[in-house]
A protein has these predicted regions:
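PP2C/PPM-type serine/threonine phosphatase catalytic domain
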Residues: 1-171
Length: 171
C-alpha cells in the first residue's frame, strides 16, 4: 500500500511479528518467549527505523556514531536486574502496550548503518563501534571486525551485526 509511510509499514510488520510469536508461545506453553527486533527501511530520500528491545541501530557519518534506536530496558537505577527488557516481540498486547520505537530521517551518501544485537554492545562501547566501522574498508570488513573484536572479549551472548553503506547511484 503506497499510501502508508515507511514507519507505518515497520509498525505493521512489528505488530504482526509480535502476534505470531506470542500465539506460538501460547500454543506451545512457552512462558516469556520473545525476541528483539531492529530494522531499517530505505526510501527515496529518507530511512525509517524501528526497534523493540535492546538490539540497536547506529548511524556512522563522517566518523561520528549516533545511536538511532531506543533501548527498551529498565532505568539505570534498576540495572542490577541485568538483561531485563521492557519491550520485546512476543509479549502480546494484553501484557502491556506493545510499542516499537519508530523514527525517520534523511540520509547522506557514505552513511553507514549498523544493526546489531546486544552481544556486540555489551562488549564494545559506542565509540569503539563507530571507529571500527568507520576505518573498515568495506561493510563486510566492518561486520567481520566488529564481531571479531566482541568475540575476543569472550562474549557469552550471541553476536549479530549487519553493516550497510549508502552510495550515490550513477547512471
Amino acid at each position: 500500500d503506497e499510501s502508508k509511510s515507511l514507519s507505518e509499514h515497520i509498525l505493521e510488520c512489528a505488530k504482526e511479528m509480535n502476534n505470531k510469536v506470542h500465539t506460538y508461545a501460547e500454543e506451545n506453553q512457552l512462558e516469556h518467549m520473545g525476541t528483539t527486533f531492529a530494522g531499517i527501511v530505505f526510501g527515496k530520500n529518507e530511512i525509517s527505523i524501528g526497534n523493540v528491545g535492546d538490539s540497536r541501530i547506529y548511524k556512522v557519518r563522517n566518523g561520528k556514531i549516533e545511536q538511532l534506536s531506543v533501548d527498551h530496558v529498565l532505568p539505570e537505577e534498576l540495572k542490577s536486574f541485568k538483561n531485563i527488557i521492557t519491550q520485546y516481540v512476543g509479549m502480546g498486547e494484553e501484557e502491556k502496550e506493545f510499542s516499537p520505537a519508530l523514527s525517520t530521517e534523511e540520509y547522506c551518501n557514505g552513511d553507514r548503518y549498523i544493526i546489531c544485537s546486544d552481544g556486540l554492545t555489551e562488549k564494545l562501547n559506542d565509540e569503539e563501534v563507530g571507529v571500527l566501522c568507520h576505518v573498515a574498508q568495506s561493510v563486510t570488513d566492518a561486520s567481520d571486525i566488529l564481531v571479531s573484536q566482541a568475540l575476543g572479549q569472550e562474549s557469552n551472548d550471541n553476536i549479530t551485526v549487519i553493516v550497510c553503506e549508502l552510495e550515490e547511484l550513477t547512471s
